[in-house]
Amino acid sequence: MTEKENSPWVEKYRPTSFKDIVLDPTNKEIMETILKKNYFPNLLLYGPPGTGKTTTIINLVNSFQEKHGQKNQGLMIHLNASDERGIDIIRNQINQFVNSQTLFKKGTKFVVLDEVDYMTKNAQQALKYLLRGIDGNVRFCLICNYITRIDESLQNEFMRLRFNQLPEKDIIN
């Protein structure tokens, strides 16, 4: 059996292209506008577990990179903040990635932070200060289930998009 055949159902059928993702009309329009324009804002996706936040952002970043000739895994870092919740993840991994020079790699860097609602308040503050000190070549995409656990001043640095459970008819079709 192949690796895909042994994968859990959710992984086996996870969309691998942005065009295959089912979203509510408002979020779909916003995401399509991001792809059409040459501007990718810092995004904060929030909502209940299992609503497609992570799949959407990974596919959106990949589609954006492809459209702009920047498809390179070295330009994106994807971290789960529930694994490393403290300030060290900001000081070490993220800061190092953001400030590293990319030889032979041109394009926008993307930092995707999943489960940000599990980060400590100090780590959230450090992230806010890092955001304010970077150039326009880096975009942050935060994902969380509970937006109330995210410092409001950090929220204000992002375009916020709420993800809700889709009606079953939308998922099946």
Model-derived regions, located:
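P-loop/Walker A NTP-binding region and its immediately flanking N-terminal helices
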Residues: 1-160, 164-170
